[in-house]
Curated annotation (Swiss-Prot):
UniProt organism field: Verminephrobacter eiseniae (strain EF01-2)
Top-level lineage group: Bacteria
Protein name as annotated: Glutamate-1-semialdehyde 2,1-aminomutase
UniProt pathway: Porphyrin-containing compound metabolism; protoporphyrin-IX biosynthesis; 5-aminolevulinate from L-glutamyl-tRNA(Glu): step 2/2
Pfam families the record matches: Aminotran_3 (PF00202)
Top EC class, one word: isomerase
Length: 437
C-alpha cells in the first residue's frame, strides 16, 4: 500500500476538515504513534476491514466491549428485534429490569443499579452520589487511573502529597479540582498519610482495581485491602471503577478476584460500562440500597439522562451477558488470552527484547520493560519510540493493537488459535527489527 493508493489517507484529510483532529475521541488519531488511522468499513468476529478492504486481527474490540467478537449472531438478533419495536421511548421498559437483575446476580456488592449512557457519566454520577451521601467534598484518585473526562477526575498530581491536584485539561477550573487528591498507585505509605491528613473530609476513594489505562497494572492485594480498611475507618466510600474490568476479567468483575484474598471484600459503589452494553452506549453504577436511595427521585442527589436505559442498548447488553454466562466461557477466554501473552513473551525472549506482560480473563497488557510496573512512574519508563516501531510493524502485518502504549488490549471469544499463532509470529518478526536497547 502506498500513499497514493491508501484510501485511509484522503478519508483522514476529509475528517480533519470536519472534526477536531479528525476523530471523535483523541486516541483514535494515532497522534502518539504517528501515521494515519484506519477507517473501519465493517467488522466480524475477531476481525475488521479498513477502507482498503485490508483485514486486521483486532485486539482493541471497541476498547473492550466486544468480548464476544464483532457481530455475534445472538447479539445482532436481539438488537434487530429491539430496533423493530422502537429506538427510544424515554419511559421505563421491562428489559431494563431484566438487565438490572442480570447484573445484580453477578455482583453481590450491588443491591440497586442506575443505568446511564457512558462510563464518564457513570463515574461522574458515582462521585456525586458519594459526596451527597457523605456530605463531604474531597476525593482520592490515583496516578494513571482514568475515570472518564468529568472535570473533577481530569487531574494530575500536585507538587507533594498534601497538595491537591492540578487540572490536566484546559477549561477545568482550579476550584473544581482543588478537592481531588492524587496518589501513587500501589503506595500504602501515601494512602495512609493521605487518610491521616484528610480522612474526615473524604467522600470517596475511586480506583481502577486493574488499571487498564496504564496498559495493565494490578492493585496489589495488600494495597486494595488497605484501601477498604481506611475507607471503612474514616467513613469514606470505596468506589471501584470496573468500566473496563467488569465482566471482562471474571464473571464477578475484578472485585470477585480480590474477594478471594480479602475476606468480606466489597466496594461501596461500582462503576460499570463497556461489556454491559455489548458495543452499544450503555453504562451503570450501583451499590447498596441505602446508598442508591440517595438518588432522585427518592433522594436529593440529582441524576438523569434522556437515553438512559435505551431499549436497543439494553437488548444488546442483555444478550451479551447471557452469552458470556454460558458454562466454560471465561475459562476458554482466559486460556486463549494467556496463550497470546505467553507466546509474545517467548517471541520477545527469542529475539532478546526486554518484555513483560500480564493478563486476566480477556484483558492483557505488555511493556517493553524487563519487569511489570507497579505504578504510573514505572510505566513511563517504557521507550515510546520502540513501542511505536512495534505498533507499526504489527499494523503492517495485519495486527491491530491500541495506538498508544498506555492502553490495555482485549481478546474476544471469536479469536481462534490460528489468530493467536499469527499474532505471535508477526510479533516475532517485528521484535527482530527492534533496535536493541
Amino acid at each position: 500500500m502506498t500513499p497514493n493508493t491508501d484510501l485511509n489517507i484522503p478519508l483522514f484529510e476529509r475528517a480533519k476538515a470536519l472534526i477536531p483532529g479528525g476523530v471523535n475521541s483523541p486516541v483514535r488519531a494515532f497522534k502518539a504513534v504517528g501515521g494515519t488511522p484506519r477507517f473501519v468499513k465493517r467488522a466480524r468476529g475477531a476481525y475488521f476491514w479498513d477502507a482498503n478492504d485490508q483485514r486486521f486481527i483486532d485486539y482493541i474490540g471497541s476498547w473492550g466491549p466486544m468480548i464476544l467478537g464483532h457481530g455475534h449472531p445472538a447479539v445482532l438478533e436481539a438488537v434487530q428485534q429491539a430496533a423493530l419495536e422502537g429506538l427510544s421511548f424515554g419511559a421505563p421498559t421491562e428489559r431494563e429490569l431484566e438487565l438490572a437483575e442480570a447484573i445484580l446476580r453477578l455482583l453481590p456488592s450491588m443491591q440497586m443499579i442506575r443505568l446511564v449512557s457512558s462510563g464518564t457519566e457513570a463515574g461522574m454520577s458515582a462521585i456525586r452520589l458519594a459526596r451527597g451521601a457523605t456530605g463531604r467534598s474531597k476525593l482520592i484518585k490515583f496516578e494513571g487511573c482514568y475515570h472518564g473526562h468529568a472535570d473533577a477526575l481530569l487531574v494530575k498530581a500536585g507538587s507533594g502529597l498534601a497538595t491537591f491536584g492540578n487540572a490536566t485539561s484546559a477549561g477545568v477550573p482550579a476550584e473544581v479540582v482543588q478537592h481531588t487528591l492524587v496518589l501513587e498507585y500501589n503506595s500504602i505509605e501515601q494512602l495512609e498519610r493521605a487518610f491521616a491528613l484528610h480522612g474526615k473530609e473524604l467522600a470517596c476513594l475511586i480506583i481502577e482495581p486493574i488499571a487498564g489505562n496504564m496498559n495493565l497494572v494490578r492493585a496489589s492485594v495488600p494495597f486494595m485491602r488497605r484501601c477498604r480498611e481506611l475507607c471503612s475507618e474514616y467513613g469514606a466510600l470505596l468506589v471501584l471503577d470496573e468500566v473496563m474490568t467488569g465482566f471482562r476479567v471474571a464473571p464477578g468483575g475484578a472485585q470477585s478476584l480480590y474477594a478471594r484474598d480479602i475476606p468480606g471484600f466489597q466496594p461501596d459503589l461500582t462503576v460499570l460500562g463497556k461489556v454491559i452494553g455489548g458495543g452499544m452506549p450503555l453504562a451503570a453504577f450501583g451499590g447498596s440500597r441505602a446508598l442508591m436511595e440517595h438518588l432522585a427521585p427518592l433522594g436529593a442527589v440529582y441524576q438523569a439522562g434522556t437515553l438512559s436505559g435505551n431499549p436497543v442498548a439494553t437488548a444488546c447488553g442483555l444478550a451479551t451477558l447471557r452469552a458470556i454466562g454460558q458454562p466454560g466461557f471465561f475459562a476458554a477466554l482466559s486460556a486463549r488470552t494467556r496463550a497470546l501473552v505467553e507466546g509474545l513473551r517467548g517471541a520477545a525472549a527469542a529475539e532478546g527484547v526486554a518484555f513483560s506482560a500480564d493478563s486476566e480473563g480477556g484483558m492483557f497488557g505488555f511493556f517493553l520493560l524487563p519487569a511489570l510496573p507497579r505504578n504510573y512512574a514505572q510505566v513511563l519508563q517504557t521507550d515510546s519510540a520502540r513501542f511505536n516501531q512495534l505498533f507499526h510493524g504489527l499494523l503492517e502485518r495485519g495486527i491491530y493493537i491500541a495506538p498508544a502504549l498506555y492502553e490495555a488490549g482485549f481478546v474476544s471469544a471469536a479469536h481462534s488459535d490460528e489468530d493467536i499463532a499469527a499474532t505471535v509470529a508477526a510479533a516475532r518478526e517485528v521484535f527482530k527489527t527492534l533496535a536493541k536497547p
